[in-house]
């Protein structure tokens, strides 16, 4: 397991860096929180409705000295305020993992205006607002955005989701260039199939994985390692790491109905 830069086993709590993970209470987000905590970070766990899971994870990570919980509905605005609140918890904020997302499989003609707004709000606008608020502090730090291997393709059946993720990919590069003089690094990870979408079976996911060039799903442990690498490597910015078993190399739609969340 990588260790946060400047942190060793004898460091005091005040010396430990702090990371905010959106959608951190469950599934992939919870795994990222565990990995960051194990590498020396104190973690601010953001949740929307998963309050019990977030509190349970907080206890698992060592209690209030090592982890905190903040609740917010990113579809209703206020993402910038979440950054300010996270910094106040431990008196510092060193990095953000934009993991929270919504997913619906609807085409451009089928998706309603309200559904499109929600997709854009949660998957693009909220992460961007958080990044911008983080940069406005004028302090060095890092940001890792969770994307999707399909940003390199055109899957017209999940239009709102993909429009938002493609926008976040472009924002990753633009913000990395713009904020480099501030010492802020902005990177992203684009995973393939990590977990079945809730309600879907492992068999359904396995059939999708068989269509990928490497024919393997993305282990959540590898995803966590990639996030830690981008968080702790000071010379990397504006990079998108594809952990998708080659999905981004395929130009045709493979009929995916499962995502990492």
List the predicted regions and their residue ranges:
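Conserved glycine-rich Rossmann-like NAD(P)H-binding loop of the short-chain dehydrogenase/reductase
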Residues: 41-55
């Amino acid at each position: 397991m990588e260790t946060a830069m400047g942190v060793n086993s004898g460091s005091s709590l005040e010396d430990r860096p702090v990371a905010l993970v959106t959608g951190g209470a469950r599934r992939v987000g919870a795994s990222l929180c565990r990995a960051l905590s194990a590498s020396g970070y104190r973690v601010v766990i953001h949740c929307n409705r998963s309050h019990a899971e977030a509190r349970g994870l907080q206890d698992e990570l060592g209690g209030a000295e090592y982890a905190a919980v903040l609740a917010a509905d990113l579809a209703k605005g206020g993402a910038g305020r979440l950054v300010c609140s996270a910094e106040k918890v431990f008196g510092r904020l060193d990095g953000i993992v934009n993991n929270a997302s919504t997913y619906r499989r609807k085409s451009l003609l089928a998706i309603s205006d309200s559904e499109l707004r929600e997709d854009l709000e949660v998957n693009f606008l909220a992460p961007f607002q958080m990044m911008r608020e983080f940069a406005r502090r004028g302090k060095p730090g890092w940001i890792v955005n969770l994307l999707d291997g399909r940003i390199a393709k055109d899957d017209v059946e999940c239009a709102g989701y993909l429009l938002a993720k493609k926008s976040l990919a472009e924002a990753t590069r633009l913000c990395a260039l713009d904020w480099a003089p501030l010492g802020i690094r902005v990177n992203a990870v684009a995973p393939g199939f990590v977990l079945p979408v809730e309600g879907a079976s492992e068999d359904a996911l396995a059939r999708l994985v068989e269509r990928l060039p490497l024919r393997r799903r993305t282990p959540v442990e590898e995803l966590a390692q990639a996030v830690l690498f981008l968080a702790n490597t000071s010379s990397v910015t504006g990079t998108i790491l594809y952990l998708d078993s080659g999905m981004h190399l395929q130009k045709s739609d493979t009929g995916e109905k499962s995502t990492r969340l």
